[in-house]
A protein has these predicted regions:
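A short, charged/proline- and glycine-enriched loop
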Residues: 25-32, 173-177
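Short beta-strand segments enriched in small/hydrophobic residues
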Residues: 30-40
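Catalytic-center loop of serine/cysteine hydrolases
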Residues: 1-20, 43, 53-178
């Protein structure tokens, strides 16, 4: 939301738009990006499922106000590109990345997911889900719900640990805390 004013200055002080003034409000929230999952079978059904899972993860995570989630357009722009953890952190500002893959054999389906901490360049959570390939929407809903429950907890734990070990740079803030 931006507020538009006709006056660009008040008493000689240049005004900034609302977005610029409040750009640091959400800086405390962990920033998460999702990489479109790899379809290891290269079939249309698998592609449909992996895209659906990532879209639903973006939707569900964006409902959690304590987490900042990259847009669908940004996330799907990562498809097929080879970024390093350092570039995700430096170029995009992500604290965490969710990635994964899907593969199938006959009527069996395996979805692998991992949550990586970009600050330490390490996987902090991963899991695999095996299902019978019946109702793709039911599978998608079940998997997304399980993933959300796990990764949100891991993000909170990691963020709390990170906040606990990072000393304040502002002594006035520290004195008020005491």
């Amino acid at each position: 939301i931006s507020y538009i004013t006709r006056k660009k200055t008040i008493d000689g002080e240049t005004l900034k738009n609302f977005d610029e003034n409040n750009s640091t409000i959400d800086d405390y929230r962990p920033k998460i990006g999702l990489i479109p999952f790899e379809n290891l079978n290269n079939d249309n059904d698998g592609e449909f499922l992996v895209d659906g899972i990532v879209e639903d993860l973006i939707t569900e995570l964006s409902m959690i106000k304590e987490i900042s989630v990259a847009t669908r357009k940004t996330c799907f722009g990562f498809r097929g590109k080879d970024y390093t953890s350092q570039s995700f952190k430096d170029e995009w500002g992500f604290d965490f990345i969710v990635s994964g893959s899907i593969r199938s054999s006959n009527d069996r389906l395996r979805i692998s997911v991992e949550l990586s901490d970009m600050n330490d360049d390490r996987v902090i959570w991963s899991n695999k889900y095996d299902r019978i390939n019946t109702d793709i929407f039911e599978i998608q809903d079940e998997i997304v719900t399980k993933i959300i429950r796990c990764i949100v907890g891991e993000i909170e734990i990691t963020s709390l640990k990170r906040a606990h070990r990072k000393p304040t740079e502002n002594m006035t803030s520290y004195e008020y805390t005491l």
